[in-house]
């Protein structure tokens, strides 16, 4: 997975013992790459906060205090949230008295508690950490209005391996408010967390890690709970897994085409030039590279003039899947380097329209310590990511479809000129006859999972929250499609390697390309030739391991 954003990492060395410490990745709110986020989530890198970014957070927090003192109605600060936006929390009258500050603290504590209402099993620890990485970086844009201590605790949780238990279900994709709130619950010393692999209470985790509990006020609770970082963590994982399947496709396809003794005509540059869709030229070149040096480039009068359609059009599926994954990575990179806060706390707000509109002017705060604007927004809506996920799911399902059909054809002696079901000549049993149901089952599930989900839902919260993206569901669906397609590719490779072995008996001088030979050899180390019927379950699982490591 590539990204053009600059890398801001520093690596220290333990010279005395000759061991390298984990890299320290410095977050500044604008330059985090997807690979860096994953590296931190896996515990392969520590986190530092860029001093300039923390100063920006401090200034933004000062703006929130100025707004609170002014008594202006600010969502989640001086008035409630959701349908309770019309309920005043306190009256400051220009002063942040102890009573005002206490009212703010009570609102924040209660908001974190009342919104901790998730369902299901806990998120995998790596994904929970990934969600915290994402939220920390978006906090550092300085647009949440949270106090700097919130950002520091996110950092400390990551570096000291305090991972709040976050339920894995209960979000409709307009900020993961019922899930992300569990992070805040641990910050205040409540709920539960994993500390260095051990499940403990939030209070125990903070004490063991040497972290002082957060005393939330102002916009702290809203900043912690109202964001999409939890669902985005699942989306990043799904994108990574889709990328792996896409990267494997040219070689898996190439090995199957060799097993078929198929025709390279559909991926020739002359053919592709006649219909220059985006990325099609590049995808065809990848397929040709995967077959370079193969006997398929040599004349063979026994070869069919035209192969079954799926062998001929997989190049289109690859081109579209690559585009979809790239677009998904692009929107995810924007998502993890920008604010999804509502309202947005803007130190850099332009004066545009302010003089012309009393409504716009009312959002501005001209305080003694900070100047800027706190403006209601719809930035919590992650529709670009949800749509990109669903497009990728559909593209991946097409790859799944092509692979299933190719595998079926490899079992058909009419197309291969080999034995039916790729049966060894001495085998009087089933060979690959029954196994077809396994990859068909995977593909049928993929067909279901590829259906759009972002329009499903009903208005909630007194009808004011009347839209949804189901971002987490879209991400989980793609992840499942990725997993299923990898299983299908394992089954296809099982068939392709068997076809190659049978073809080499028939045509000993048949040559594989270097890339397909590498895959063939890796697969054969774990999955032997099928001479007689055997249990195939372990073969399928071992094939997946080979492909994941390839």
Question: Which residues does each predicted region cover?
Answer:
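Long, structured ligand/cofactor-binding scaffold of large enzymes
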Residues: 46, 52-75, 80-192
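Short, Φ-rich (hydrophobic/aromatic) sequence segments
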Residues: 14, 136-137, 235-236
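Generic secretory/membrane-interface signal
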Residues: 4-6, 15, 170, 342, ...
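Gram-negative bacterial Sec-dependent N-terminal signal peptides
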Residues: 1-21
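C-terminal auxiliary extensions adjacent to catalytic cores
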Residues: 23-45, 49-56, 60-68, 72, ...
């Amino acid at each position: 997975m590539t990204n053009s954003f600059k890398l801001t990492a520093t690596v220290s060395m333990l010279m005395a013992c000759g061991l390298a410490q984990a890299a320290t990745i410095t977050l500044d709110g604008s330059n985090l790459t997807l690979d860096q986020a994953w590296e931190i989530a896996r515990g392969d890198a520590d986190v530092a906060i860029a001093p300039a970014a923390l100063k920006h957070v401090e200034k933004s927090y000062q703006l929130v205090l100025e707004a609170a003192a002014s008594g202006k109605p600010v969502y989640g600060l001086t008035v409630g949230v959701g349908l309770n936006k019309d309920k005043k929390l306190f009256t400051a009258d220009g002063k942040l008295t102890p009573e005002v500050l206490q009212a703010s603290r009570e609102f924040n504590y209660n908001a974190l508690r009342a919104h901790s209402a998730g369902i299901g099993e806990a998120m995998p620890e790596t994904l929970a950490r990934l969600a915290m990485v994402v939220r920390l970086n978006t906090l550092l844009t300085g647009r949440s209005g949270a106090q700097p201590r919130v950002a520091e605790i996110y950092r400390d949780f990551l570096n000291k391996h305090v991972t709040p238990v976050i339920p894995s279900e209960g979000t409709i994709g307009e900020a993961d408010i019922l899930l992300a709130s569990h992070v805040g619950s641990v910050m205040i010393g409540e709920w539960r967390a994993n500390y260095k692999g051990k499940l403990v209470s939030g209070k125990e985790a903070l004490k063991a890690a040497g972290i002082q509990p957060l005393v939330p006020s102002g916009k702290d609770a809203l900043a912690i709970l109202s964001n999409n970082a939890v669902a985005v963590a699942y989306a990043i994982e799904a994108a990574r897994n889709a990328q792996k399947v896409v990267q494997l496709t040219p070689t898996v396809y190439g090995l199957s085409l060799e097993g078929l003794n198929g025709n390279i005509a559909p991926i020739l540059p002359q053919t592709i030039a006649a219909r220059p869709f985006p990325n099609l030229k590049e995808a065809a070149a990848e397929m040709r590279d995967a077959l370079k040096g193969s006997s398929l480039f040599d004349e063979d009068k026994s070869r069919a003039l035209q192969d079954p359609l799926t062998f001929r059009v997989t190049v289109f599926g690859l081109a579209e899947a690559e585009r979809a994954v790239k677009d998904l990575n692009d929107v995810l990179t924007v998502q993890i380097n920008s604010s999804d806060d509502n309202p947005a706390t803007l130190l850099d707000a332009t004066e545009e329209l302010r003089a012309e509109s009393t409504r716009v002017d009312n959002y501005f705060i001209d305080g003694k310590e900070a100047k800027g604007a706190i403006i209601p927004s719809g930035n919590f809506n992650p529709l670009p990511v949800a749509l990109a996920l669903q497009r990728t799911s559909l593209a991946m399902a097409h790859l799944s479809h092509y692979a299933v059909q190719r595998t079926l054809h490899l079992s058909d002696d009419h197309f291969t000129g080999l034995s039916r079901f790729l049966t060894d000549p001495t085998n009087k049993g089933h060979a690959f006859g029954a196994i077809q149901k396994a990859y068909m089952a995977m593909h049928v599930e993929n067909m279901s999972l590829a259906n759009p989900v972002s329009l499903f839902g009903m208005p909630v919260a007194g009808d004011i929250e009347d839209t949804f993206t189901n971002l987490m569901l879209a991400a989980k669906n793609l992840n499942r499609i990725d997993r299923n397609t990898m299983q299908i590719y394992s089954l296809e490779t099982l068939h392709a390697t068997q076809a190659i072995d049978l073809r080499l008996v028939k045509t000993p001088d048949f040559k594989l390309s270097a890339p397909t030979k590498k895959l063939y050899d890796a697969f054969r180390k774990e999955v032997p030739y099928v001479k007689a019927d055997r249990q195939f379950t372990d073969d399928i699982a071992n094939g997946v391991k080979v492909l994941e490591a390839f």
